[in-house]
Amino acid sequence: MTLYEELQARGLVAQITDNEIIDLINNGKATFYIGFDCTADSLTAGHFMALTLMKRLQMAGNKPIALIGGGTTMIGDPSGRTDMRKMLTKEDIAHNAACFKKQMEKFIDFSDDKALMLNNADWLLNLNYVELLRDVGACFSVNNMLRAKCYEQRMERGLSFLEFNYMIMQSYDFYYMFQHYGCNMQFGGDDQWSNMLGGTELIRRKLGKDAYAMTITLLTDSQGKKMGKTAGNAVWLDPNKTSPFEFYQYWRNVGDADVMKCIRMLTFLPLEQIDEMSTWKDQRLNEAKEILAYELTSMVHGKEEAERAQAAARALFGGAAMDTEHMPSTQLTEADLTDGSIGILTLMVKAGLAASNGEARRLVVQGGVLADGEKVAAPTVSFTAEQLKKGVVIKKGKKVYHKVTL
């Protein structure tokens, strides 16, 4: 099986600009890039598709370029957005880029020039605006840009001229790297298709040469929602933002309808093994979820942390003695207490178990909250400083555990 055939079998290929792509990646002749706008100081589970794709392609002899969007982050990509992104300072972007590289090195081998990490601020921030309009802007049709899917959602709410330039900036990235780094391919999410076509067309018009683009399938659940968030919050690759246990539990709790799709798209397990697992039903689906969670946690946090997270999860949900060492936790201070105690509703909000007192109240009234194994009888229940110093384990629903201490 060729690399391209494997990518298809794993459900990763969405669109390609040209069949020439197949020969390039199969023969290890692609120098390709994927862009990462550094809008936070950590990558998320939503970046998994891109990171694992880069690893697969590099293993086949292709050369990855991880492009940090130091310049484009200052504009903000409107793709898939209904509002304008927060503007970041140069210092914020530099810090975020450094954090990204550390995490990417777990997937990509940057040694001996096997891969590059570039920052488009190095060329975008030095551009002369008049020259850009004359040399690059002339290659773009405003009519075509307005028809692009990435701008559709923003037109009614208002699209700033700043964001309207994003397609030109991304296209210029490809054009610049084609000339200076031999980059002949771009990969990205399926929502980036219009921006990517802009780059291949700019290279064709300015240089008379061919460049290629392929979009990868967006990772969505059976309801069509993007995966990589829990309770509205991102699942981070940084262990200080999302602990290895929480990370493990996110993947352990994916829906029955989504587990095999995630295994196929995100792990490096052989396709033959995955095909066999696809026949699993009922309780064996839980085994598949454990495999998924272990494989991904191992990739991000290492085998030791994956084993510890798996052991802790089995102890929590398997009826064994409770292991709270790796459980998500919140440490309160005396300032969080009122007259030496804290109510269950306030505690749940501070621990991130509920978005508001109202939501916490509803969960308690419905009987979905336990404290140290006992059902919380009423929304008026409170915990003393003495109890909190020993640690209180809150259970929400069937699978969410959280330790609160003082």
Predicted regions and their residues:
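Buried hydrophobic packing segments
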Residues: 50-57, 177, 195-203, 296, ...
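N-terminal catalytic cores of NTP/NDP-binding nucleotidyl/phosphoryl-transfer enzymes
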Residues: 21-78, 186-193
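Short acidic, glycine/serine/threonine-rich loops at helix termini
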Residues: 76-80, 127-133, 225-231
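Positively charged, low-complexity intrinsically disordered leader regions
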Residues: 1-32
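Divalent-metal (Mg2+/Mn2+/Ca2+)-assisted nucleotide/phosphate chemistry catalytic cores
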Residues: 10, 89-90, 96-217, 221
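Conserved nucleotide- and phosphate/pyrophosphate-binding catalytic cores
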Residues: 203-406
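Divalent metal-coordination and catalytic microenvironments
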Residues: 7, 44, 117
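A charged helix-plus-loop insertion that forms the helical arch/lid used to bind
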Residues: 78-94
